[in-house]
Structure formats: C-alpha cells, structure tokens
C-alpha cells in the first residue's frame, strides 16, 4: 500500500495500535508487536504496519497480508486512517 510519513517523532507500536483501534472501529482486530502493528479484518485479510523513525518524522509502511485481493481493502482502510489521524499531526 505504501508509506505514510507523519510529522511526529517517536510513535510507539502500542500508541499506533490504540489510534488504529479507535479510528477503524469494532470490525478490525489490532495487535501491537515489536515495531509492528497487525490489523485483521478477517482470517483471510490483514495489514501489517511497520514503524520507522526519520529525521523529524515517523514513517509507517503499510502492506497487505493474507489473500491479496481481500487484503488490499484492509491495507487501504489502515492507510486512510493513518493519513486522516489528527493524533499524528505533530506535538
């Protein structure tokens, strides 16, 4: 799905998981792991978000996991939620 760069440094996986849980709603299962957040819509559809720090920003890399066509919708929903999230606009 691509990369989303937000102008906020030091976003943690647990913080990202909390924001995605609120933004995506009850139809998604969100779990944080070491530097990665996994978002599942169904057993066949998931998105993996990796967190990378950049100078003055945080970069989220969103990729689909599972059945390709089904995962595309999940990864797109995650990427849209990240882009529209006011929590990551800056401190």
Model features per residue range: what roles?
Residues 1-26:
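Terminal, regulation- and interaction-focused segments at domain boundaries
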Residues 1-3, 34-37, 55-59:
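A generic structural signal for beta-strand entry/edge sites
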Residues 5-11, 41, 62-64:
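Short beta-strand-to-loop capping motifs
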Residues 20-28, 82-89:
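Hydrophobic, Leu/Ile/Phe/Ala-enriched alpha-helical segments that form helix-helix packing faces
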Residues 23-51:
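Amphipathic, interaction-prone secondary-structure segments
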Residues 24-25, 49, 56-60, 78-82:
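Short, low-complexity, polar/charged sequence segments that are solvent-exposed and flexible
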Residues 48-73:
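Intrinsically disordered, low-complexity regulatory segments enriched in Ser/Thr/Pro
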Residues 66-91:
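Intrinsically disordered, low-complexity regulatory regions enriched in serine/threonine/proline
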């Amino acid at each position: 799905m691509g990369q989303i760069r937000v102008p906020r440094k030091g976003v943690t996986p647990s913080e990202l998981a909390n924001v995605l849980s609120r933004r995506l709603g009850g139809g998604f299962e969100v779990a944080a792991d070491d530097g990665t957040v996994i978002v599942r819509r169904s057993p066949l559809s998931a998105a993996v978000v990796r967190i990378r720090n950049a100078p003055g920003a945080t970069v989220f890399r969103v990729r689909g996991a599972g059945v390709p066509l089904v995962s595309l919708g999940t990864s797109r929903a995650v990427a849209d939620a990240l882009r529209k999230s006011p929590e990551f606009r800056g401190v």
